[in-house]
Amino acid sequence: MTTQTTNIRDDIRKADDVFEKNFSQGNAAGIAELYTNDGMLLPTGSDFVKGKEAIRDFWQGAINMGIKEAKLDIVEVEVQGNVVVEVGHYQLKGAGGDVLDQGKYIVIWKQEGGQWKLHRDIWNTSRTA
């Protein structure tokens, strides 16, 4: 791993930490601010969720459904030109620490305003139906 990749991985980990903190505080607006202005979610069973307002509303809905904590574990970070691809595992917990879902994700990160921000965010569960 190059020094540049190591530094970018650290930047992505810090951004993931902020995502997790905002989630645990029920701060959907704070989560949405971590995305680019034209950011997009690609959730299972749903159409594209485009833009910060829609992203905020999506995460607020998840919080309202009882998800209290999101844990993100990076598996790999790969620099590809002017974007970064993060692959990892996630775990969503409810009140009392009950695991509500777990799975894997890919995020394409893009710099905006000098900061790495989530640009495309896709995930799917590892749980069987």
Model-predicted regions and their roles:
Residues 2-33, 40-129:
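A beta-strand edge to alpha-helix "cap/lid" segment located at domain peripheries
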